[in-house]
Amino acid sequence: MDNAPPEVRNHVFIVEDSAPIRERLGALLRDIEGVSIVGEAGSVRAAVEGILRTRPESVVLDIQLLDGSGVDVLREVCPKAPEVVFVVLTNHAHPQYRRICMEAGASHFFDKSTEIGKVREVITGLGATRH
């Protein structure tokens, strides 16, 4: 029997201004085999610096942040790290926000109040495609 830890196939960075929600997302994602949380941030500045430093495969991103918007993160990071998959998870799931986020480089856009389970599905799927 092989007792080696599972291979990490998806390094994830979480960007969320609410610490309790960040913790909940971390717990939800850490439970997925092959996923490793490589960083967390609650502000635009910390998110941009952390994402560019850790180069995760995917980022779970809120729109409302302590010092600005998740759209600012998308506009700053996507040109520098186009390989990163951004999954926007927000309470502001209006069509105009969806359009703006997708145009700025997001790959997925979900409503935090009704679609949090879809984040798990996407992150699981990303890990499954990387082996």
Q: Which residues are covered by each model-predicted region?
A:
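Conserved acidic carboxylate
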Residues: 16
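The feature encodes the CheY-like receiver
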Residues: 66, 94
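Non-catalytic signal-transmission and effector/linker regions of two-component phosphorelay proteins
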Residues: 1-11, 117-131
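Active-site beta3 strand of CheY-like receiver
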Residues: 54-60, 65
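Short amphipathic alpha-helix used as the core "switch/output" element in two-component signaling
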Residues: 71-81
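Acidic catalytic/metal-coordinating carboxylates
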Residues: 43-46, 69-72
